[in-house]
Amino acid sequence: MRAIYDYIIYTDGGCERNPGGRGGYGAVIINNSTGELTDISGGFRSTTNNRMEVMAVIKALEKIEKGTHIQLFSDSQYVIKTMNGMFRKKKNIDLWKKLDKLAVAFEIEWNWVKGHNGNTYNEKCDTLCQEAMTLPELEEDVGYMNTDSVPEQSDTVAQSLEKYNMYPDCSDVESYQEKYLVNPI
């Protein structure tokens, strides 16, 4: 008998000093057919907690066979609310583009889980994330740009979003939720 979901994924990301500190991400992938668990983790020297939350989802999806049905849990309202169309994709556009490109290859049910609340897999992801950010040799997060060092721009935020086509394709929240199988928070 086929399982309802091919995979169940839990993700977490964090940063020791946000923004600009050492960050890490962690994910646990559960193969629902075999029960096999796969842990994924990594980190960066200079990043943000939100970038690591999105990165955790990307890295997990990159390990999964396309066309499968996934139940995904994240303790990041930033991730879940952005994927269900409640937040606009204003920052971390490089990661959102990657995630959007990956997400369309799957049937994903997006779920929020309360962090640090005793959920075994969420706690495991948090541990993976914390361990990853302490690794001695971390890469620079090339997509991260510390906004404190960016010179003033003449464009308004709206002009910049328009210019760089940064508006997500989620203006119709209901169709976006249906497309990505999002459970409203």
Where are these regions (language model features)?
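RNase H-like nuclease fold core
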Residues: M1-R51, E62-I64, T68, D126, ...
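RNase H catalytic domain
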Residues: Y5-I8, G14-P19, M55-D148
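Charged/polar, low-hydrophobicity segments characteristic of intrinsically disordered regions
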Residues: F87, E162-N165
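N-terminal cationic amphipathic segment used for targeting or macromolecule association
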Residues: V113, S154-T156, S171, I185
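Intrinsically disordered, low-complexity regulatory segments in eukaryotic proteins
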Residues: E152, T156-K163
